[in-house]
Amino acid sequence: MGQQFVWRLQSRFSSIRRASVILQHLRMSKHTETAEVLLERRGCAGVITLNRPKLLNALSLNMIRQIYPQLKKWERDPDTFLIIIKGAGGKAFCAGGDIKALSEAKKAGQTLSQDLFREEYILNNAIASCQKPYVALIDGITMGGGVGLSVHGQFRVATERSLFAMPETGIGLFPDVGGGYFLPRLQGKLGYFLALTGFRLKGRDVHRAGIATHFVDSEKLHVLEEELLALKSPSAEDVAGVLESYHAKSKMGQDKSIIFEEHMDKINSCFSANTVEQILENLRQDGSPFAMEQIKVINKMSPTSLKITLRQLMEGSTKTLQEVLTMEYRLTQACMEGHDFHEGVRAVLIDKDQTPKWKPADLKDVTDEDLNSYFKSLGSRDLKF
């Protein structure tokens, strides 16, 4: 009788333990499904997975607040030798920030636009100064905030599915997240062209442009990641060696590049002017179908954003990244107070009529005085690192 009682008791405890394990697993699964960002220690690396695939892994303030402290922790950890960042879902690395939420918060008098840009730029700077090898797998759409999470890192791996763009002038903003630093440092006037037109680079062109350091076929990304994770106490040179070997074996996207083979001379000559008006005049004088297409595109953009962007890149070409991010923070706060950003969000993301009514509507009406007001110091509210 006593023995049977013990067995029953053991059986009950076993059932409770089993139920507890199942419940814990379900909780973890639910957390994994709903967590916006996954932060995992795997092999020799810290792995960051942007986990909002239905929203193309759009970057939120909540995600930034999880990534930044973990990045700093892994940077200090002697057992973490590299950091990998990637996007879930196969369509996007990160398509940018939640621009609509920014506009709505500003109209409601909330501080999201101050907090998000400040903390995002501090994270961008931390990525640039990270003492551990940082590998961004930019497979799929990479725009805006996604560019900030990748382009400042030591290694950026593009695939045939990569799509890079900085389309902010079309919504009354400017190419931020350090765009004023990295864009003017691309070959020739390529960065100025990308910034003013929002032109989309695809596949191998993302590597040709210098946005990516390596190109790997997307079907090989998983094995590349596993090989990186399996490295024993790797140095930056060891990581580079693995990336180089996969880059050398890549077969996808070998077609010649129209943008680099046919249009770079035009881009360099037309976009070398010091004013947006003169860039447009250069394009008119060129008169080629490519040039005329760029005129059409530029004429749809916010005139204020175009002038801000050109000055941002010209000034950024001689500044440090921290100086650029400080400048860009000032610009974001001024744009939040202005008309064009909220009008751009309305036309592109809310009503989706694609016909924003810019104010001013003409380049000639955006004065130097207007422009200076965007670049002025915020005093005690300036960005601090």
From Swiss-Prot:
It catalyses: 3-hydroxy-2-methylpropanoyl-CoA + H2O = 3-hydroxy-2-methylpropanoate + CoA + H(+). It holds the Pfam family ECH_2. One of its GO terms (molecular function) is 3-hydroxyisobutyryl-CoA hydrolase activity. It comes from the Eukaryota. GO terms for cellular component: mitochondrion. InterPro entries: ClpP/crotonase-like_dom_sf, ECH_dom, HIBYL-CoA-H. Hydrolyzes 3-hydroxyisobutyryl-CoA (HIBYL-CoA), a saline catabolite. Has high activity toward isobutyryl-CoA. Could be an isobutyryl-CoA dehydrogenase that functions in valine catabolism. Also hydrolyzes 3-hydroxypropanoyl-CoA. It is found in: Mitochondrion. NCBIfam families: PRK05617.1 (NF004127). Optimum pH is 7-9 with 3-hydroxyisobutyryl-CoA as substrate and 6 with 3-hydroxypropionyl-CoA as substrate. Residues 1-32 form a transit peptide. Highest activity in liver, kidney and heart. Low activity in muscle and brain. Its EC number is 3.1.2.4. This is 3-hydroxyisobutyryl-CoA hydrolase, mitochondrial. It is an enzyme of class 3 (hydrolase). One of its GO terms (biological process) is valine catabolic process. Pathway: Amino-acid degradation; L-valine degradation. The keyword Cell membrane does not apply. The keyword RNA-binding does not apply. Belongs to the enoyl-CoA hydratase/isomerase family. Its main location: mitochondrion. The modification N6-succinyllysine is found at K54, K91, K100, K220, K249, K256, K296, K300, K352, K376. Substrate binds at E120, G145, E168, D176.
